[in-house]
Amino acid sequence: MSFKKHLKKFSAVICAVAICMAFTACGSKGSGDKVYKVGMEPTFPPFDTTNEKGDLDGFDVDLMKAIAKDQGFKVEFKSLEFEGLITGLKSGNIDIVASGMWASDERKKEVDFSNTYYESGLVVAVNANDNKIKSIDDLDKNSKVAAQIGTSSAELIQKMQKEGKIKEAKIYNKVNDAVQDLQNGSVSALINDKPVTKEYMNKQKGKIKIVGDPLNKENLGIGVQKGNKELLDKINKGLANLKKSGEFDKLLKKWNLN
């Protein structure tokens, strides 16, 4: 075979490979989007909950789906204990924390947070039949106070117990268990985020109530691993675009957060 024939045959093979690669690239578009694992604790409505099918649901789920769509990536949701969210993020078990988490200075030492997506605050809730406790100042050395593990409210009541201001700080893995004990009188009060407490009030009509003013202000953020600027930028850009388009406000309204 002549050199020219060899050259023609070689060129044909190269062209065929190039065409194949082009078709493969086109065919994989969309199916090859980056997938990020999002961790959340599902007893924190309306931010994080489960629907009637048992699937993770809530404002944070809808928000992350909308950000992912806007920024061209995909998300998978994982249910974790609240206390394990930051640990899971640092270990690489999850890529994102979207669970109504306060971007506190202490947490910022371990996590990079997005721009604020919601301003919340802690409130005191009591049994609806309790007319003695009207604010946090009415909690005393006979009071058993509940909070969820790993939260700012847990830190607060543990400090109150240490200082002798309350009898016992009862820490729960899940908020709904704390609400149940509040209803049956096992604890005197529950300290928790206002939107979440209001959601449980609506579900348990006439059984619990909020007393006094909010105790603080907490800016909620979406967390990523320290130094993951690429992912953080995507989340912040997505948030900004959703707010600009009006989609963010629609989600707030859907979950009664407006």
Describe each region flagged by the PLM:
Residues P42, E119-V126, K198, N202-K237, ...:
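Periplasmic-binding protein-like
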Residues K69, E83-I96, E110-D112, D137-D138, ...:
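Short helices/loops that flank or line small-molecule/ion binding pockets
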Residues K65, K74-D138, I208, P214:
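Acidic, polar ligand-binding/catalytic clefts
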Residues M21-A25:
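C-terminal motif of bacterial Sec signal peptides marking the signal peptidase cleavage site
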Residues V61-D70, D130, D137, I149-T151, ...:
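Extended ligand-binding regions for polar small-molecule ligands
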